[in-house]
A protein has these predicted regions:
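Mobile "lid/hinge" segments at catalytic clefts and subdomain interfaces of large enzymes
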Residues: 129-153, 157, 189-194
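Glycine-rich phosphate-binding active-site loops on the catalytic face of alpha/beta enzymes
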Residues: 1-2, 118-138
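Generic recognition of stable, solvent-exposed alpha-helical segments in well-folded globular domains
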Residues: 85, 138, 142, 159-166
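Short glycine/serine/threonine-rich phosphate/pyrophosphate-binding segments
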Residues: 105-111
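A mid-to-C-terminal "edge-of-domain" accessory segment
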Residues: 151-194
Length: 194
């Protein structure tokens, strides 16, 4: 946990013990030759509450050998300008790869994910069609579409880009969730203009 509120009220352990748990867990996984992506759950809420502690948690994970640090906007409530400011501070302080994991409770997940890549993040966690708990996660269809087509960032090959619509529809079908007609990039009404 990266939010001191959760450490105290959910884990019910002292803040230093939580740091030790993070270190021990990452160290154990690295001792087993695992690649470790440390998802810093509730990082943005934690940062807004106690920035020093939230940053300490990711330092501890990095120092224990995490291969990539992933600050998570678990509540999906961080506005893009504030999100980018926090991401830039994390990037300035860490000398390891950084990614992001955004939920979509306030409809900011795609914008925040794209902005994070523009700021220097090297990984985006998301889901096809944005499916996920509550209001969902960053829709990888839109993230990929914007990074590749709007910003020219080579995040997927041209062949993979051509598979977005088919993959999106396949995921909708196996999830038994009707694909939105107006889903950006792949919906039936995308790019239909008068």
């Amino acid at each position: 946990k990266t939010w001191d509120l959760h450490v105290k009220d959910v884990f019910r352990v002292p803040l230093e013990e939580n740091l030790k748990m993070i270190s021990d867990t990452v160290s154990y996984l690295k001792s087993k030759d695992k690649t470790v992506f440390y998802d810093a759950e509730h990082f943005f809420d934690g940062y807004k509450s106690n920035a020093d502690y939230a940053i300490k948690t990711v330092f501890v994970a990095r120092d224990a050998g995490a291969d990539c640090i992933i600050p998570c906007d678990t509540n999906g409530g961080t506005i893009t300008s504030e999100f980018v400011e926090i991401v830039k501070e994390v990037l300035a302080k860490l000398d390891c790869p950084v990614g992001v994991h955004c939920h979509n409770d306030c409809d900011m997940a795609v914008a925040n994910s794209v902005a994070a890549v523009q700021a220097g993040c090297v990984q985006v966690q998301g889901t096809f069609n944005g499916y996920g708990e509550r209001c969902g996660n960053a829709d990888l269809v839109s993230v990929i579409g914007n990074l590749k087509l709007k910003l020219g960032i080579d995040c997927v090959s041209g062949a993979r880009l051509k598979e977005l619509t088919e993959t999106s529809r396949f995921v909708a079908e196996i999830s038994n969730v009707k694909q939105r007609e107006n889903q950006p990039f792949v919906g039936n009404t995308a790019f239909t203009h008068k």
